[in-house]
């Protein structure tokens, strides 16, 4: 069984992430989405909320069951988590040349530390190249329409999150 590991913060999950996830299922029998947990980084959505959002997208939009999609956390080196779950390769999405430069550097370092793990780069779709979780959060925090950038369940979750923040007078 070929297992792919797709890591990120997914805060929130965007249509760009989903396109990369779809491409991952063409290459792998099972995809493990690994949400990076960083103590110093304040997330908008909790780990549990992100798991729910990703799992729901897998089921509802991609028609992928729990036998092919698993969501986990990691706070270690990515290669250590990949080895732990038996991953055959790492999936990385590329939006532009800046991503490529960074990801090639990371793939090179990972290749030295874990030569048995390959990194597979999947290019973002034309419509997904401009999407970043940071921009989506900023637009949503100001009450903007993010429906073109995220799936419906994430759009609802963002709306609820920021509506609550605005009602309490603390928009981040």
Curated annotation (Swiss-Prot):
UniProt keyword ATP-binding, yes or no: yes
Site features described as Transition state stabilizer, chain residue numbers: 17
Coiled coil: none
Major subcellular location class: cytoplasm
Function: Reversibly transfers an adenylyl group from ATP to 4'-phosphopantetheine, yielding dephospho-CoA (dPCoA) and pyrophosphate.
Oligomeric and partner information: Homohexamer.
Database matches in Gene3D superfamilies: HUPs
Molecular functions (GO terms): ATP binding; pantetheine-phosphate adenylyltransferase activity
CDD domains: PPAT (cd02163)
Protein name per UniProt: Phosphopantetheine adenylyltransferase
Family as reported in the entry's similarity comment: Belongs to the bacterial CoaD family.
Biological processes annotated in GO: coenzyme A biosynthetic process
Compartments (UniProt record): Cytoplasm
Top EC class for this record: transferase
Residues at which substrate binds: 9, 41, 78, 92
EC number: 2.7.7.3
Species annotation: Bartonella quintana (strain Toulouse)
């Amino acid at each position: 069984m070929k297992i792919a590991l797709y890591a990120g913060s997914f805060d929130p999950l965007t249509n760009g992430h989903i396109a990369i996830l779809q491409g991952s299922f063409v290459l792998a029998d099972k995809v493990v989405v690994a949400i990076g947990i960083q103590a110093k980084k304040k997330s908008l959505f909790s780990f549990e909320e992100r798991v729910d959002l990703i799992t729901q997208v897998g089921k509802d939009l991609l028609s992928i069951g729990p036998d092919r999609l698993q969501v986990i956390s990691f706070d270690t080196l990515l290669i250590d988590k990949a080895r732990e779950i038996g991953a055959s390769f790492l999936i990385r999405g590329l939006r532009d040349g800046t991503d490529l430069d960074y990801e090639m550097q990371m793939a090179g370092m990972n290749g030295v530390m874990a030569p048995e793990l390959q990194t597979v780069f999947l290019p973002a779709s034309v419509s997904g190249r401009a999407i970043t979780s940071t921009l989506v959060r900023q637009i949503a925090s100001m009450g903007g329409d993010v429906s073109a950038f995220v799936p419906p369940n994430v759009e609802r979750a963002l709306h609820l999150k920021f509506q609550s923040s605005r009602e309490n007078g603390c928009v981040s």
